[in-house]
Regions:
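Walker A (P-loop) ATP-phosphate-binding motif of ABC ATPase nucleotide-binding domains
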Residues: 2
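Hydrophobic anchor at the beta1->P-loop junction of P-loop NTPases
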Residues: 5
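The conserved Walker
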Residues: 9
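Conserved lysine of the Walker
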Residues: 13
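Hydrophobic positions on the alpha1 helix immediately C-terminal to the Walker A/P-loop
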Residues: 16
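NTP-dependent small-molecule kinase module
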Residues: 23, 130-178
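Conserved nucleotide-sensing/catalytic segment adjacent to the nucleotide-binding pocket
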Residues: 27-82, 87
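A glycine- and Lys/Arg-enriched "phosphate-lid" helix/loop adjacent to the NTP-binding pocket
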Residues: 87-139
């Protein structure tokens, strides 16, 4: 089974992807971990796509977590399940700010980010929060279009609440035992 987990920052993608990995034992590729080890150049973008392709062809089953719409089309085509997490924008902002504060206080990095990655309360961070706030109107139409073009609506599972996530994980546990 090939699973992608998408959704705005703060929607719970990384957490859900790790839980799916615990249940299935499929290899997991967190795209933030991959991308934020680069210098963000044009060469890095090519490498980023190649690494995703290599991961997908090297593993019969996998989980890829992250949006990155520039490379999403190929992942949508390859995936058996598209898990799209949708949460209200205020909740996503709250979660992102809270995890940033926790990281600053605890001085720990996220497991889905490189050790060297650090967030600062600067203009770039505020732009990131603005990106999250406007994700629904600026990014969701592109994602919906990619899903439609790939004729992948039958692969799509939209999860909006903790309960829906838990029900999905419970169902996945049952499926993975069979």
């Amino acid at each position: 089974m090939k699973i992608i987990v998408i959704g705005q920052s703060g929607s719970g993608k990384s957490t859900l992807a790790r839980k799916i990995k615990e249940i299935t034992d499929f290899p997991l590729l967190p795209l933030d971990l991959l991308w934020h080890t680069t210098d963000y150049s044009i060469q890095a973008k090519k490498w980023f796509l190649q690494e995703q392709q290599l991961f997908m062809v090297s593993n019969p089953s996998w989980i890829v977590e992250g949006n990155y719409t520039s490379t999403l089309e190929e992942r949508i085509k390859e995936a058996d399940k598209i898990i799209w997490l949708k949460v209200p924008r205020y909740l996503a902002i709250y979660r992102v700010v809270w995890r940033s504060l926790k990281r600053k206080i605890n001085k720990k990095s996220r497991p889905d980010m490189p050790e060297s990655f650090s967030e600062k309360l600067n203009r770039e961070y505020l732009e990131f929060l603005s990106f999250i706030w406007h994700f629904e109107e600026n990014n969701e139409p592109k994602i919906q279009q990619l899903i439609q073009v790939a004729n992948a609506r039958n692969k799509l599972i939209i999860l909006k609440t903790r309960r829906e996530k838990q029900e999905f994980l419970t169902k996945l546990k049952i499926e993975s035992k069979n």
